[in-house]
């Protein structure tokens, strides 16, 4: 595949080629401390995320080095050495396992995401192997800007003190597996349920000249976004945050269900995979993902689609 962009397009999309010597060096030293004192099985199950993956240069290098580290450590632990004639195939299997289960990536360029899928497959392909499916792992999006699992303290929504308003401070992250505070008066509210000064803010002189009356109405409307919330507002925000909590947990369970329905079992050197093989084609996996997870062409939206809609609406 040859992917060529003109200079300006390349600059606008931040599409730059990373030389192999650089990816090898950076990945080597990133893994050096991380892999210290880890068992082979721990190495095999490390997850890797590249927030600006491009066509997966760094992901491929991480897979290569993790696979080599796993086999080397497993040989030391078991005392069993893979024969030269089988080593390449066994290495490719380990690379396929890591790519299929533990690799995640995001990129602004949708074409780059498609190229990354092909690149990972070509890097991990082996005789008799399955075609990997990356729909739940490699996505087109912006990893820097957007709604997140972050909250503001309830007190920041009602204060009139300058510098203490929610929109003047960064929200607090709530890691998966931990709960936000829910006690009335001390609860935390998800940031994407709240207004922001940047909403409907137009500074373009041309637009101001074309629609002065509407711009004034929008300015007045914008002021309401950042006004302190009332007691009734807080009741609604607590309820909505509770619904978000439920949707998040349901989405996690749904994701696990999708992964179980689309998973391909793969045992590698020194590790027997106990996952149940889905025996599904790429097309069948796409249908499962579209209907069950994304709720496309379905009468009712599932938890992922509902949560995504709310977060996308805030971003827009």
Task: Put a short name on every predicted segment.
Residues 1, 6-8, 12-316:
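SAM-dependent methyltransferase catalytic region
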């Amino acid at each position: 595949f040859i992917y060529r962009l003109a200079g300006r397009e390349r600059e606008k999309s931040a599409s730059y080629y990373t030389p192999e010597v650089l990816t090898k060096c950076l990945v080597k030293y990133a893994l050096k401390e991380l892999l210290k004192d880890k068992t082979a099985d721990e190495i095999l199950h490390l997850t890797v995320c590249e927030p600006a993956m491009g066509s997966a240069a760094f992901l491929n290098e991480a897979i290569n080095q993790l696979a080599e580290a796993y086999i080397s450590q497993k040989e030391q632990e078991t005392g069993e050495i893979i024969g030269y004639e089988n080593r390449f195939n066994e290495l490719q299997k380990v690379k396929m396992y890591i790519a299929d289960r533990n690799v995640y990536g995001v990129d602004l360029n949708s074409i780059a995401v498609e190229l990354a899928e092909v690149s990972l497959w070509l890097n991990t392909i082996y005789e008799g192997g399955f075609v990997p499916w990356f729909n739940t792992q490699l996505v087109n999006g912006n990893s820097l800007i957007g709604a997140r699992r972050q909250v503001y303290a309830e007190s920041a929504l009602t204060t009139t003190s300058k510098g203490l308003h929610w929109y003047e401070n960064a929200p607090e992250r709530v890691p998966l597996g931990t709960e936000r505070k829910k006690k009335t008066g001390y609860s935390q509210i998800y940031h994407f349920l709240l207004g922001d000064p940047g909403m409907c803010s137009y500074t373009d002189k041309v637009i101001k000249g074309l629609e002065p009356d509407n711009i004034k109405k929008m300015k007045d409307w914008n002021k309401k976004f950042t006004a302190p919330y009332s007691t009734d507002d807080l009741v609604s925000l607590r309820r909505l945050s509770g619904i978000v909590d439920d949707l998040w947990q349901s989405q996690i369970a749904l994701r696990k269900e999708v992964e179980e329905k689309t998973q391909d079992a793969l045992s590698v050197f020194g590790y027997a995979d106990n996952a149940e093989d889905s025996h599904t084609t790429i097309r069948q996996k796409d249908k499962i993902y579209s209907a069950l997870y994304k709720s496309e062409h379905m009468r009712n939206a599932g938890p992922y689609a509902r949560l995504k809609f709310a977060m996308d609406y805030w971003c827009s």
